[in-house]
Amino acid sequence: MKPSERRKARRLAVQAIYSWQLSQNKVADVEHEFLTEQNTDGVDVAYFRELLTGVASKTSQIDELLKPHLDRKFEEVSPVEKAIVRLATYELTFRKDVPFKVAINEGIELAKAFGAEDSHKFVNGLLDKLVKHK
Protein backbone atom coordinates (compact mmCIF):
# COMPACT_ATOMS: atom_id res chain seq x y z
CA MET A 1 0.00 0.00 0.00
CA LYS A 2 1.25 3.43 -0.92
CA PRO A 3 1.36 6.30 1.59
CA SER A 4 -0.74 8.32 -0.84
CA GLU A 5 -3.56 5.76 -0.50
CA ARG A 6 -3.62 6.30 3.25
CA ARG A 7 -3.44 10.06 2.80
CA LYS A 8 -6.48 9.92 0.54
CA ALA A 9 -8.23 7.66 3.06
CA ARG A 10 -7.57 10.25 5.79
CA ARG A 11 -8.92 13.08 3.62
CA LEU A 12 -12.09 11.15 2.91
CA ALA A 13 -12.39 9.98 6.53
CA VAL A 14 -12.10 13.46 8.00
CA GLN A 15 -14.91 14.62 5.71
CA ALA A 16 -17.02 11.62 6.71
CA ILE A 17 -16.31 12.20 10.42
CA TYR A 18 -17.30 15.85 10.00
CA SER A 19 -20.53 14.79 8.28
CA TRP A 20 -21.25 12.19 10.97
CA GLN A 21 -20.66 14.74 13.77
CA LEU A 22 -23.08 17.24 12.27
CA SER A 23 -25.75 14.89 10.96
CA GLN A 24 -25.75 12.37 13.83
CA ASN A 25 -26.62 9.74 11.21
CA LYS A 26 -25.56 6.16 11.75
CA VAL A 27 -21.90 5.59 10.95
CA ALA A 28 -22.83 2.83 8.50
CA ASP A 29 -25.06 5.27 6.61
CA VAL A 30 -22.33 7.92 6.44
CA GLU A 31 -19.82 5.29 5.30
CA HIS A 32 -22.18 4.05 2.58
CA GLU A 33 -22.89 7.60 1.42
CA PHE A 34 -19.20 8.45 1.11
CA LEU A 35 -18.21 5.21 -0.59
CA THR A 36 -20.99 5.48 -3.17
CA GLU A 37 -20.92 9.23 -3.81
CA GLN A 38 -17.21 10.07 -3.57
CA ASN A 39 -14.37 9.15 -5.90
CA THR A 40 -12.46 6.39 -4.12
CA ASP A 41 -9.80 5.85 -6.79
CA GLY A 42 -6.45 5.47 -5.06
CA VAL A 43 -8.08 5.41 -1.61
CA ASP A 44 -7.25 2.72 0.95
CA VAL A 45 -10.93 1.98 1.53
CA ALA A 46 -10.28 -0.45 4.39
CA TYR A 47 -8.29 2.24 6.22
CA PHE A 48 -11.02 4.81 5.54
CA ARG A 49 -13.55 2.45 7.11
CA GLU A 50 -11.33 1.81 10.12
CA LEU A 51 -10.75 5.51 10.74
CA LEU A 52 -14.43 6.40 10.47
CA THR A 53 -15.74 3.52 12.58
CA GLY A 54 -12.82 3.74 15.02
CA VAL A 55 -13.30 7.44 15.71
CA ALA A 56 -17.07 7.00 15.99
CA SER A 57 -16.80 4.10 18.43
CA LYS A 58 -14.12 5.73 20.57
CA THR A 59 -15.21 9.38 20.46
CA SER A 60 -15.69 9.71 24.23
CA GLN A 61 -12.29 8.17 24.97
CA ILE A 62 -10.59 10.32 22.31
CA ASP A 63 -12.25 13.50 23.60
CA GLU A 64 -11.13 12.76 27.17
CA LEU A 65 -7.54 12.43 25.92
CA LEU A 66 -7.78 15.79 24.14
CA LYS A 67 -9.60 17.93 26.72
CA PRO A 68 -6.70 18.41 29.20
CA HIS A 69 -4.57 19.90 26.43
CA LEU A 70 -7.07 22.41 25.06
CA ASP A 71 -6.75 26.15 25.50
CA ARG A 72 -10.55 26.52 25.30
CA LYS A 73 -13.70 24.55 26.02
CA PHE A 74 -14.11 21.50 23.81
CA GLU A 75 -17.51 22.80 22.70
CA GLU A 76 -15.75 25.87 21.25
CA VAL A 77 -13.55 23.83 18.91
CA SER A 78 -14.90 24.03 15.36
CA PRO A 79 -16.48 20.87 13.92
CA VAL A 80 -13.76 20.67 11.25
CA GLU A 81 -10.99 20.88 13.85
CA LYS A 82 -12.77 18.30 16.01
CA ALA A 83 -12.93 15.88 13.10
CA ILE A 84 -9.22 16.39 12.36
CA VAL A 85 -7.93 16.05 15.92
CA ARG A 86 -10.20 13.09 16.62
CA LEU A 87 -8.85 11.29 13.56
CA ALA A 88 -5.22 12.10 14.43
CA THR A 89 -5.75 11.12 18.08
CA TYR A 90 -7.25 7.82 16.97
CA GLU A 91 -4.13 7.12 14.93
CA LEU A 92 -1.80 8.23 17.73
CA THR A 93 -3.58 6.10 20.31
CA PHE A 94 -4.86 3.02 18.52
CA ARG A 95 -2.63 2.62 15.45
CA LYS A 96 0.81 1.88 16.80
CA ASP A 97 2.01 1.16 13.24
CA VAL A 98 1.57 4.86 12.37
CA PRO A 99 4.59 6.90 13.54
CA PHE A 100 3.51 9.83 15.71
CA LYS A 101 5.25 12.29 13.37
CA VAL A 102 3.18 10.98 10.46
CA ALA A 103 -0.08 11.28 12.42
CA ILE A 104 0.74 14.85 13.47
CA ASN A 105 1.90 15.90 10.01
CA GLU A 106 -1.19 14.41 8.37
CA GLY A 107 -3.37 16.26 10.90
CA ILE A 108 -1.61 19.52 10.04
CA GLU A 109 -2.09 18.90 6.31
CA LEU A 110 -5.78 18.13 6.83
CA ALA A 111 -6.15 21.37 8.80
CA LYS A 112 -4.48 23.32 5.99
CA ALA A 113 -6.84 21.71 3.47
CA PHE A 114 -10.12 21.92 5.39
CA GLY A 115 -9.69 24.21 8.39
CA ALA A 116 -9.78 27.95 8.93
CA GLU A 117 -6.70 30.10 8.34
CA ASP A 118 -4.77 29.16 11.49
CA SER A 119 -6.32 25.75 12.14
CA HIS A 120 -3.07 24.00 11.36
CA LYS A 121 -1.35 25.84 14.22
CA PHE A 122 -4.06 24.78 16.66
CA VAL A 123 -3.95 21.16 15.45
CA ASN A 124 -0.15 21.06 15.60
CA GLY A 125 -0.04 22.49 19.13
CA LEU A 126 -2.77 20.23 20.46
CA LEU A 127 -1.36 17.02 18.98
CA ASP A 128 2.16 17.94 20.10
CA LYS A 129 0.92 18.37 23.69
CA LEU A 130 -0.95 15.08 23.48
CA VAL A 131 2.16 13.18 22.34
CA LYS A 132 4.39 14.76 25.00
CA HIS A 133 2.00 13.74 27.78
CA LYS A 134 1.39 10.15 26.68
Curated annotation (Swiss-Prot):
Protein name: Transcription antitermination protein NusB
Transmembrane segments: none
Biological function: Involved in transcription antitermination. Required for transcription of ribosomal RNA (rRNA) genes. Binds specifically to the boxA antiterminator sequence of the ribosomal RNA (rrn) operons.
Highest taxon of the lineage: Bacteria
Gene that produces this protein: nusB
GO aspect biological process, one term: transcription antitermination
InterPro entries: NusB-like_sf (IPR035926), NusB_fam (IPR011605), NusB_RsmB_TIM44 (IPR006027)
Source organism per UniProt: Shewanella frigidimarina (strain NCIMB 400)
Cellular component terms per the entry's GO annotation: cytosol
Keywords of the record: RNA-binding, Transcription, Transcription antitermination, Transcription regulation
Family named by the database record: Belongs to the NusB family.
HAMAP family: NusB (MF_00073)
GO molecular function, one term: RNA binding
Record Gene3D superfamilies: NusB-like
Keyword set includes Transmembrane helix: no
Pfam families in the record: NusB
Keyword Transcription included in the entry's annotation: yes
